[in-house]
Design a protein with these regions (language model features):
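ATP/NTP-dependent adenylation/nucleotidyl-transfer catalytic domains that generate, transfer
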Residues: 116-195
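ATP-dependent adenylation/nucleotidyltransferase module used to activate substrates
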Residues: 1-113
Length: 195
């Protein structure tokens, strides 16, 4: 975002952020999981809708979100519609204009139009998203751990602490390595309780 602000100084940028730091929300709600993915709402969708309401003064504002989701990224994303109304948030219309583009088309477009490139692509990632995600593959987890160890250490320590509460000590390491924490549901082992 900061590079974009420098590159386009005449544009007005509005930043939408959750009032919760990711590490605080992970401690409070537990690590996000495939069946319990609260993270996108807390850190992306809701802050965007709240910022839009603040800017427009209209509580019933709807957002049109242009995203970079592509079918090639995963079997799950391949099933997404190019335009979806209310699929992710009732106040949001998602438009995925590059949904059917492949990697070659993406990079040709970026290079031809001299578009800024996120450094994550230079580090070998084929998409940019959350560094620690319950929907990520083992490959993604390995790459982010290798490329961004300082950025993910806080979230990984929260996963470690959560797992220490729900598994016997001799099973914790294997449970984490195999992504068992990504399959949790409910809040049974959270400090503030749960089902």
């Amino acid at each position: 975002v900061e590079n974009a602000k420098l590159h386009w100084p005449d544009l007005r940028f509005y930043e939408a952020k959750s009032h919760l730091d990711p590490s605080d929300s992970w401690r409070e709600f537990g690590p996000p999981a495939a069946k319990n993915r609260w993270c996108c709402a807390v850190h992306k969708s809701v802050p965007t809708i709240l910022k839009l309401r603040e800017i427009t003064g209209n509580y019933n504002s709807k957002a049109v979100v242009f995203d970079g989701v592509r079918a090639e990224e995963s079997a799950r994303r391949a099933k997404y519609d190019e335009i979806s109304i209310g699929a992710k948030n009732i106040s949001q219309i998602n438009c995925s204009p590059i949904h059917k583009w492949n990697n070659a088309e993406i990079y040709c477009y970026i290079l031809k139009n001299r578009i800024m490139l996120n450094d994550a692509y230079r580090n070998g990632l084929f998409r940019v998203g959350c560094m620690v995600c319950p929907m990520s593959s083992d490959w993604w987890d390995s790459m982010t751990k290798f490329c961004y160890p300082d950025e993910i250490v806080k979230l990984h320590s929260i996963v470690d602490n959560y797992c220490a509460n729900c598994k016997p000590e001799n099973e914790v390491k294997k449970y984490i390595e195999q992504g068992g924490w990504k399959m949790r549901s409910g809040g049974r082992f959270l400090p503030n309780g749960g089902n």
